[in-house]
């Protein structure tokens, strides 16, 4: 594993600018009891971008390779040791020498904060010894100003350490540089040089901005869980009270010095008489006694004891005391409120400290590693400082209102995600109300390569990097994830291991969606699910890497289509009109078929749901679609006996489309299924369809003696002259059956058919008793020498056919033009109906005769 976080740091806010920490030695031993347990500092997680490279994901190096990329490198400033003082002339805030300097400046800040009101009230021109001390302090602050132009800081938005000198300088100039610089001016010398103008002395108060360093010190002590929180808070409150009274005492004395010596009696201290001691000519009294008297006046006034021994004399003093007492009421409320919070342990900081202690006990007990310790503490500190868990206050608000809040906060982000391009507003709304907001620090791994993923993430702010393992076993950066990006969707949608690691580069605000919730939404919004998979396959964000997953994506698209088709067919099968409409409204295509080629119309017709059939016809489902078994919706309705549905389909132009219709009808006749035969014939079935033996359904009915079936077939137009491959007609089958009624029915049908179609009698006769004739290739009057051997041929239906057949059998050459057939008397035969069975014919060319006829020659 690559280099992790270098050291632990104490949290400091530094005016919202940077948060320099304090590196402490980490305790590695587990404490035996709670009382003696080691308390750790709250740590600031370092800028860990580029850390944890190498072996963290080596176990998955053989899986899901995504190609080779050049890794992205980052420069990280040194953290510890003397070598880290300057890095490109930038000081790391965690350098131990710089931390010592900040403590040195803290001492001067305490001195300056207390001495500035004292100088303003009691001195008009510093004595020599205090003057040199003041100059030394200002020099120290000037050095600190110079150093702060080179101190790196942590960006509050990205949480990355900024080492750019220009950015550091601009940031400092925009913050406290002006006040720090003005505070270093020698205002005492300027006051004397300006002729002791009183207005100049007011500029001394600029130095009170240095009190912010003291405030930051107390704030860091409150967060340092090694120090008792109650003690820290009490010390802070005492210091606040003393500083307020100290400043008020200096102002009280200053008000008295603004009047000339001749009017000292009109001041609170000049008119003061304590016992036998008079404060007339108070400027000549010892400095300590004057300060203590002023401090006593300030404290008694703040406590509103009102002994009356010291009181205001002139109007200015009265006005200041009124302002001071009003301020004291606010200060008193602040002090009492803080003490109450200490007693009931209700402050946010104390809750954070308690939570941190519990976490540290857990980490010590389970002996967690250094890297995971840093991440846990960093997250706790982030929760405390950013207050991003404040959304928990909404838990008591109704779900509907929380949903509206989520839409207001997160909907713009989700709508801009490329993964959801083209999705419906209803789908986006369902996604938004199920989002959870999370923050991650730089360097943290959110998803690891090869792991099972059950969360989908969307980037609101910050930056992340996708890292894969190359063929050489080293980490390689695959892609950068910026705002409006998403990750985890490949593993979630394709149900495969995470193809690459996702690591935080900058402080990130992410929106998290649970896989189960996402799957549930996709089951309802089918079209949006297909759109998401399509967007994923077309995404350029992953470049060529997505090509390796195209088969998975295609498989899941097909799987989703098949599942959706089954759900539509299932709704049609059970006649669930509401569910069917909901599915189609959500984007399901009713024209799709299942694994057997069946559409919803097949199943609805099979079950006899007329309303479903009407709805599907309105949706444009193919009315004549055949499944893998050759069944159409109309045939399904006919088979199941749903006359109303069959009538509806037939009226819309549906066809029965019976494959091997003869076999179907013959089988139905054989089993006596009169209803099926009647419906099949009523909706377009052919009563004369033949099976593999050329038998018509009427053959089967006659052979089996099924009178009603035969009558049904005859009424539907079945021909009694149909012959099978053995030349048998239904009438022959009826005679063999021995059923008198059957024979009578078929004889009557024969008579009726002959009356309508007379030619059929001849056709049957020809088929039943075929005629033949003898054909000779010479003239009937030729002598014995010219006679030739003839052939016997069947008489076809046309004279041309007879000539052609005889020519072929006799082996005569030529096209057959000019050939004539003559009878025994030499007369030309023009029609096959003139030829009787067994007649002799002669095939000649031209008219023929003794004087001019010519016989056909081979």
Curated annotation (Swiss-Prot):
This is Potassium channel KOR1. Residues 772-858 form the KHA domain. The chain crosses the membrane at residues 103-123, 131-151, 175-195, 202-222, 237-257, 317-337. Residues 1-41 are annotated as: Disordered. Gene3D superfamilies: 1.10.287.70, Ankyrin repeat-containing domain (1.25.40.20), Helix hairpin bin (1.10.287.630), Jelly Rolls (2.60.120.10). The segment S4 is probably the voltage-sensor and is characterized by a series of positively charged amino acids. The pore-forming region H5 is enclosed by the transmembrane segments S5 and S6 in the Shaker-type (1P/6TM) and contains the GYGD signature motif which seems to be involved in potassium selectivity. Residues 27-41 have a biased composition (Acidic residues). CDD domains: CAP_ED (cd00038). A nucleoside 3',5'-cyclic phosphate binds at residues 419-539. GO terms for cellular component: monoatomic ion channel complex. Residues 1-102, 152-174, 223-236, 338-858 are cytoplasmic. Residues 293-312 dip into the membrane without crossing it. It is a multi-pass membrane protein. It comes from the Eukaryota. It is found in: Membrane.
């Amino acid at each position: 594993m690559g280099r992790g976080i270098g050291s632990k740091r104490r949290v400091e806010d530094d005016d919202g600018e940077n948060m320099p920490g304090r590196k402490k030695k980490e305790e590695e031993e587990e404490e035996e009891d709670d009382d003696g347990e080691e308390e750790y500092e709250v740590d600031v997680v370092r800028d860990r971008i580029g850390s944890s490279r190498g072996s963290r994901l080596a176990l998955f190096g053989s899986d899901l390779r995504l190609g080779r990329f050049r890794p992205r490198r980052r420069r990280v400033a040194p953290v510890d040791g003397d070598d880290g003082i300057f890095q490109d002339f930038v000081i790391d805030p965690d350098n131990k020498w710089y931390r010592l300097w900040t403590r040195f400046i803290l001492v001067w800040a305490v001195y300056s904060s207390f001495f500035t009101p004292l100088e303003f009230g009691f001195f008009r021109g510093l004595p020599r010894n205090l003057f040199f001390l003041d100059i030394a302090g200002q020099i120290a602050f000037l050095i600190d100003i110079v150093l702060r132009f080179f101190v790196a800081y942590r960006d509050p938005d990205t949480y990355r350490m900024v080492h750019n000198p220009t950015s550091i300088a601009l940031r400092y100039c925009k913050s406290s540089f002006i006040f720090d610089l003005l505070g270093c001016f020698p205002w005492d010398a300027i006051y004397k040089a300006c002729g002791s103008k009183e207005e100049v002395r007011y500029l001394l108060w600029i130095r009170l901005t240095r009190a912010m360093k003291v405030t930051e010190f107390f704030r860091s002590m409150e967060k340092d869980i090694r120090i008792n929180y109650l003690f820290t808070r009490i010390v802070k409150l005492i210091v606040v009270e003393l500083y307020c009274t100290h400043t008020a005492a200096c102002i009280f004395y200053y008000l008295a010095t603004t009047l000339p010596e001749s009017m000292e009696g009109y001041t609170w201290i000049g008119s003061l008489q304590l016992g036998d001691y008079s404060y007339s000519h108070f400027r000549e009294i010892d400095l300590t006694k004057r300060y203590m008297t002023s401090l006593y006046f300030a404290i008694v006034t703040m406590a509103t004891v009102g002994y009356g021994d010291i009181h205001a004399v002139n109007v200015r003093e009265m006005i200041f005391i009124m302002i001071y007492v009003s301020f004291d009421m606010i200060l008193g409320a602040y002090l009492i409120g803080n003490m109450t919070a200490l007693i009931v342990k209700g402050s946010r900081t104390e809750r954070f400290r308690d939570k941190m202690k519990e976490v540290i006990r857990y980490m010590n007990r389970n002996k967690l590693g250094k890297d995971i310790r840093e991440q846990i503490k960093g997250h706790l500190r982030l929760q405390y400082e950013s207050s991003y868990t404040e959304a928990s206050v909404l838990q008591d608000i109704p779900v509907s209102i929380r949903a509206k809040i989520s839409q207001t906060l997160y909907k713009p982000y989700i709508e801009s995600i490329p993964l959801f391009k083209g999705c419906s507003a209803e789908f986006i709304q369902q996604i938004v109300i199920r989002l959870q907001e999370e923050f991650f620090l730089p360097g943290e791994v959110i998803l690891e390569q090869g792991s099972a993923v059950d969360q989908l993430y969307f980037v609101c702010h910050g930056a992340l990097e996708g890292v894969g393992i190359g063929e050489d076993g080293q980490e390689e950066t695959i892609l950068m994830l910026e705002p409006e990006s998403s990750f985890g969707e490949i593993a979630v949608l394709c149900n495969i291991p995470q193809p690459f690691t996702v690591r935080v580069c900058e402080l990130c605000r992410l929106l998290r969606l649970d896989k189960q919730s996402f799957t549930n939404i996709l089951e309802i919004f089918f079209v949006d699910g297909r759109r998401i998979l399509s967007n994923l396959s077309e995404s350029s964000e992953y470049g060529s890497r997505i090509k390796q997953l195209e088969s998975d994506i295609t498989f899941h698209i097909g799987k989703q289509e098949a599942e959706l088709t089954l759900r539509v067919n299932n709704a049609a099968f059970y006649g669930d009109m509401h569910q069917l409409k909901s599915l189609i409204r959500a984007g399901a295509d009713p024209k799709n078929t299942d694994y057997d080629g069946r559409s919803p119309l097949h199943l609805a017709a099979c079950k006899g749901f007329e309303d479903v059939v009407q709805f599907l016809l309105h949706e444009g489902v193919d009315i004549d679609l055949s499944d893998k078994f050759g069944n159409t919706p109309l045939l399904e309705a006919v088979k199941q006996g749903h006359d109303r549905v069959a009538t509806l389909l037939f009226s819309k132009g549906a066809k029965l489309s019976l494959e091997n219709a003869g076999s179907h009808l013959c089988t139905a006749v054989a089993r006596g299924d009169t209803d099926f035969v009647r419906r099949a014939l009523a909706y377009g079935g052919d009563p004369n369809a033949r099976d593999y033996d050329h038998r018509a359904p009427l053959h089967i009915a006659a052979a089996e003696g099924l009178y009603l079936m035969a009558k049904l077939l005859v009424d539907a137009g079945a021909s009694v002259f149909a012959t099978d491959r053995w030349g048998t007609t239904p009438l022959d089958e009826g005679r063999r059956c021995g059923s008198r009624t059957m024979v009578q029915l078929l004889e009557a049908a024969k008579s009726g058919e002959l009356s309508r179609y007379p030619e059929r009698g001849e056709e049957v006769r020809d088929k039943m008793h075929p005629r033949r004739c003898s054909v000779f290739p010479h003239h009937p009057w030729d002598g014995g020498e010219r006679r030739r051997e003839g052939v016997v041929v069947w008489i076809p239906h046309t004279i041309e056919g007879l000539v052609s057949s005889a020519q072929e059998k006799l082996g005569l050459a030529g096209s057959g033009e000019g050939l004539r057939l003559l009878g025994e008397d030499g007369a030309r035969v023009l029609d096959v109906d003139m030829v009787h069975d067994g007649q002799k014919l002669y095939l000649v060319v031209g008219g023929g005769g003794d004087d001019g006829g010519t016989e056909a020659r081979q």
